[in-house]
Amino acid sequence: MKRIVLTAMTIAMALTATAQQYSFTFVPAGRTDTVLYIGRYYRDAVTLVDTAHAKGGRYVFKGRRDWPRGLYALVAQDGKKTVADFCIDGSRKFTISGDATLKAESVTVKGCKANSQMFTYIATENAAKREVDSLRALKKDEATREAAEAAEKRVIERMGAFEATACHPKNPNVFFDLQNACEPPEVPEEVEDKNTYYRMHYWDSLFAAPLGTLRPTLLHSPQLFSKMNYFFFGMLYYAASDTISAEVDRLMARIGDDTALARYVLDFIEPRYFRSTKNVGWDAVWCHIASEYYLKGRCPWALPGTITNMRYNYNRIKQSIIGAHGQELWMADTNQSADPNDWISSHRFPTPYVILWFWDPDCHHCQEQSEELKKLYDGMVARGEKRFEVYAVGYESDVAKWKRYVKEHKFNWVNVGGTNVNIDYQEAYNVHGAPTMIILDWHRDIIMNKVLPAKNIMSFLDEYEKKQGVVREY
């Protein structure tokens, strides 16, 4: 037992001996926090890793530790709000002073060239932005427009030269290394499809960087998270699911065997596509990510339980994504016949479209949406222009209540419900709440799996037919 204790003590002493002594002092004038923290970034989270208590307006973090080179956050006493970012790069003893928020223009740095350069860069950028903003009003006035545009051009050229010098690869500074690795692409003037070019070259700067040495720094930087988050949930927010899935594949192909970077990306985007209930097509993107990466064993970090749950959800969701063939339901109508020969099919209507409407008479939102859908349906029938049938499934265990509601509100479409049904429609169409809307086309393939306001249904069908090159004959 003594040998074990001595061995543990020896290891601890060795680790302490190899760790570097550090002293990081922050002097934010007028700040009243009793304590500040140092936080380390990872994706959209900041983990608190060190603490300093206020003494005479100074916050001194000191001790022995191996600090990885990178960008860190100085965090307020609430443990959430970032006061300012700073570098740990080379120097292990420095002082950063400034106003209460350490605004870049107010900051002075002693003992750390990297931090001095970073705050100077940010202050210069901020000043240039203020110059450009001040010229906006002048550009609107015809009398001053030409001079304002010329002045703006000079500011942009000046900043371009400044950035080229500051961010030059020969300038060893972790902040500039991160800026270069996450720099957006420049689109040549002669390129016609600028949006596509920008998207196709979006990740070039990252993979031009020396990932072997820079990877740990990148993974713990706000720059990489911002770049990734903007790409998937900014640029591609309204993109078709096929486009998003293709971009996931392109990025993962470039990442290759870099497990740390693959995990950084996939474990961030996967749950966000999974949880989305409003974005059309995101469930298909999630199914693609799940099937191509997690379920094929390409995510070695994923726990067995995670994979089991993902496989269950994948098998459940894939049946109702856009493009899947809708499963045919046979259900009893309000007569509630137990004879399957009397049941009504969800597919066998002469109309080119079928709207599967899963609703609950006790659901206020269902009531409102059903009334709007009824107005659209009745008006369409009255005009003799029946583009779709509504196959309304009563999502209610109290059959008598459901039948009474249908009768009182004069729902003249196809009303089905109860337990007389050929398959579990909740599993077939991923119905786990009401209302749920599924629109089937003439092949009875799913073309929409989100609830559309009734006023938007006709325009959606028009747009769908336009994309399919269909000429209406009804």
Please report, for each region that a protein language model flagged, where it lies by residue.
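Structured, charged N-terminal subsegments at the starts of enzyme catalytic cores
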Residues: 196-260, 266
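Structural microenvironment flanking redox-active thiols in thiol-disulfide oxidoreductases
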Residues: 367-407, 421-427
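Bacterial Sec-dependent N-terminal signal peptides
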Residues: 1-27, 474
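A non-transmembrane, solvent-exposed segment enriched in polar/low-complexity residues
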Residues: 20-173, 177-209
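Short active-site neighborhood of thiol/selenol oxidoreductases, capturing the structured segment around
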Residues: 342-373, 389-391
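N-terminal "domain-start" segment that seeds a small globular fold
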Residues: 301-346, 455, 459-469, 473
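N-terminal targeting signals for export/organelle localization
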Residues: 242-325, 474
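Thiol/disulfide oxidoreductase modules built on the thioredoxin-like
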Residues: 421-463
